[in-house]
């Protein structure tokens, strides 16, 4: 079991979540949060091919599906997180960002809160960016150097 398996097992557990049981749910609340965070509107992903790089339990995969994505490929290094993601995306895979080969076929690529957890953030960014097709969109979130606040809506 990897460190991330342990983390996701803990984070998705009843004891950790307490009153925040909906933190990783698949609901309209997640869709609205995704729209707010990305600026994507209700029809913004219609017919698009998307990638959720470092998908965790799949809350953003779900949002992309609900916003009309034709296909969402999802992967994460944690087998624990992938178990949950497969509830909404049976094709979700366990894998590392560092295994990505240049493959610019995605209209929209998301990597939320993932890149800075890798041994080489710049290389991780390059690997993820290599998946975006011409005129596609790459949306990432990384902590800044002074990250000292709780993320509102996370």
PLM feature segments, named:
Residues 122-134:
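A short glycine-rich, Lys/Arg-flanked "PGG" loop and its adjoining helix->strand segment in the class I
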Residues 99-104:
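Short conserved loop adjoining the S-adenosyl-L-methionine
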Residues 57-98:
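Class I SAM-dependent methyltransferase SAM/SAH-binding core
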Residues 110:
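A conserved beta-strand element that flanks and buttresses the S-adenosyl-L-methionine
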Residues 1-44, 48-54, 137-154:
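Conserved class I S-adenosyl-L-methionine
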Residues 113-114:
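Short catalytic micro-motifs in class I SAM-dependent methyltransferases
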């Amino acid at each position: 079991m990897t460190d991330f398996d342990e983390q996701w097992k803990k984070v998705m557990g009843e004891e950790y979540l307490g009153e925040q049981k909906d933190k990783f749910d698949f609901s309209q609340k997640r869709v609205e949060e995704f729209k707010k965070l990305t600026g994507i509107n209700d029809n913004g992903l219609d017919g698009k091919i998307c990638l959720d790089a470092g998908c965790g339990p799949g809350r953003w995969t779900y949002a992309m599906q609900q916003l009309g994505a034709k296909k969402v490929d999802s992967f994460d290094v944690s087998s624990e997180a992938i178990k949950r993601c497969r509830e909404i995306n049976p094709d979700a895979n366990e894998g590392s960002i560092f295994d990505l080969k240049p493959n610019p076929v995605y209209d929209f690529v998301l990597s939320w809160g993932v890149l800075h957890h890798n041994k080489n953030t710049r290389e991780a960014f390059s690997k993820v960016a290599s998946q975006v097709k011409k005129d596609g969109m790459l949306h990432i979130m990384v902590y800044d150097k002074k990250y000292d606040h709780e993320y509102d809506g996370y």
